[in-house]
């Protein structure tokens, strides 16, 4: 089980990561990682950002049948 400090340190070392990758790296359940990231965000230590993947061929994401599949939420330290 990871601690809040370990999550912060991993973000500091990697720069930007998504919650799934943090969960895998620290061998910690996803709900716990999400809770810790939300806590870091509330403390003003981390921020979430949306990243658009470059796999969109049509350019019309609003009407895309994939919905939000081309969006990825990443976290970084402030």
From Swiss-Prot:
Gene Ontology MF annotations: DNA binding; iron ion binding; iron-sulfur cluster binding
UniProt key word Transcription regulation: yes
Residues that hold iron-sulfur cluster according to the record: 56, 61, 64, 70
Residues annotated as transmembrane: none
Alphabetized UniProt keyword annotations: DNA-binding, Iron, Iron-sulfur, Metal-binding, Repressor, Transcription, Transcription regulation
Disulfide linkage: none
Family of the protein in this entry: Belongs to the FeoC family.
Function, as annotated: May function as a transcriptional regulator that controls feoABC expression.
Name of this chain's protein: Probable [Fe-S]-dependent transcriptional repressor
Natural source organism: Cronobacter sakazakii (strain ATCC BAA-894) (Enterobacter sakazakii)
